[in-house]
Amino acid sequence: MLFRSFFGSTYNLRPGAAIVDHSRSFAIVRSGRLDVTVLGTFEVEATGRMANYRTLDMASGCPGGSPELAGGAKRVILALEHADRHGRPRLVATATNPVALPRIVDLIVTELGWFEPGGDHFIATELAAGVTRAEVEAATGAPVVFA
């Protein structure tokens, strides 16, 4: 079945696919039937807690629906750039932005590789092609253990 989005993109829906409105999508999230959610965030701590908003005095953002998505999904994956636009690490020992909820993320994917929270360090489970351990260690704001 072909579906054309509001912006003109065409998608081929597979059997089992569903299109729902905003309120029903959050009903699915709250029901506990969501297997995986993929989110972005400003920072993620080595403990796995994500800081995904800033306060008003920080001039940007609010948590939106991500606390509900993270709390309602069985598995939480973060997809983000390894450093912010100023070159500061986004994988850190302790977040400088507010932590939205204590939920621990399961996997962090950046352009440098795949990482899991390890408590006081990150576990690099896979590095991107051509990326060295030294590059990962230099770009990360917490210790990194390589699996």
Which ranges hold each PLM region?
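Conserved phosphate- and dinucleotide-binding cores of soluble alpha/beta proteins
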Residues: 1-147
